[in-house]
């Protein structure tokens, strides 16, 4: 669990580095949480998604709880589709993640519209594409870390 938390913290630092890109920046934290939900499925990943979402809200200055709601919702869906996602190719997973992330971004726009905050919809679409396109990088990096530290009992 310590390695998982370290990867979340590293994802936070990478998110801070890409913060000036705004909505064009990839969602590093979400991808890391999704990877751990696919690699080691358990209900504790829902709590991890909630905490990560709260951290993202604080860092980005968003409405507190909105990211955690969407993170928990996405991780729940990932856990329900675990058997299907686990055996997909990386490209297929990236397409599925694009759809999930785009829906999350769309719901975020809707939630911000309710509280009278305008968001550039095109930037969210590009951000979803960028996020899905870096999935292979996140997947292979975290898989290497998982195997190196023998997390989950796999060599």
Question: Model features per residue range: what roles?
Answer:
Residues 1-155:
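Terminal, non-globular segments
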């Amino acid at each position: 669990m310590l390695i998982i938390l370290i990867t979340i913290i590293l994802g936070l630092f990478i998110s801070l580095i890409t913060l000036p890109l705004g909505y064009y920046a990839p969602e590093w934290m979400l991808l890391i949480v999704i990877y751990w939900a696919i690699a080691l499925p358990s209900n504790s990943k829902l709590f991890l998604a909630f905490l990560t979402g709260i951290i993202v809200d604080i860092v980005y200055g968003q409405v507190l709880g909105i990211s955690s709601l969407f993170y928990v919702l996405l991780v729940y869906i990932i856990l329900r589709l675990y058997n299907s996602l686990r055996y997909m190719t990386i490209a297929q997973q990236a397409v599925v993640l694009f759809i999930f992330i785009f829906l999350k971004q769309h719901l975020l726009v809707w939630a911000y519209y309710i509280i009278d905050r305008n968001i550039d919809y095109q930037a969210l679409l590009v951000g979803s594409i960028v996020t899905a396109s870096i999935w292979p990088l996140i997947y292979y990096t975290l898989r290497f870390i998982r195997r190196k530290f023998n997390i989950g009992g796999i060599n």
